Amino acid sequence: MTPIDNDELKCLIKAIGMKAYVEILFPALIKDKNISVMELCQKYPEFNKYTPDAQNTRRSKARKIFENGWEVEALKTISLSTRTNSCVRAKAKDLELKYKK
């Protein structure tokens, strides 16, 4: 695990979007870190609302979080954020507790 750089983590989360990370990318990548954009679009139809470039960016930024071992810390950051709705924060907290190392 790479030491956590909170500024970099926040930039990655911002590029992905908190809701997209919690509801789409974290659940997908926790099961398969090499999931393709096409598979994401098939499994999570709401991912289709993003342009192809945005889909690639969001997936690659989320993979970077996982590669650094920051996936649970990202959930914690989101669960403490005041910049997303309470449902997303609650789901992030539930996932954080479930996957905490």
PLM region spans:
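Helix-turn-helix/homeodomain-like alpha-helical modules used for DNA recognition
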Residues: 87-101
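Basic, low-complexity segments
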Residues: 1-7
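Short, basic interhelical loop/turn and adjoining N-cap
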Residues: 42-57
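Short acidic, hydrophobic short linear motifs in intrinsically disordered regions
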Residues: 36-40
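DNA major-groove recognition helix of helix-turn-helix
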Residues: 59, 63-66
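Short coil/turn linker and secondary-structure boundary residues
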Residues: 4, 32-35, 50, 83, ...
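Short Lys/Arg-enriched helix C-cap and helix-to-coil transition segments
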Residues: 67-83
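Short, amphipathic alpha-helical "recognition" segments used to contact nucleic acids or chromatin
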Residues: 9-35, 62
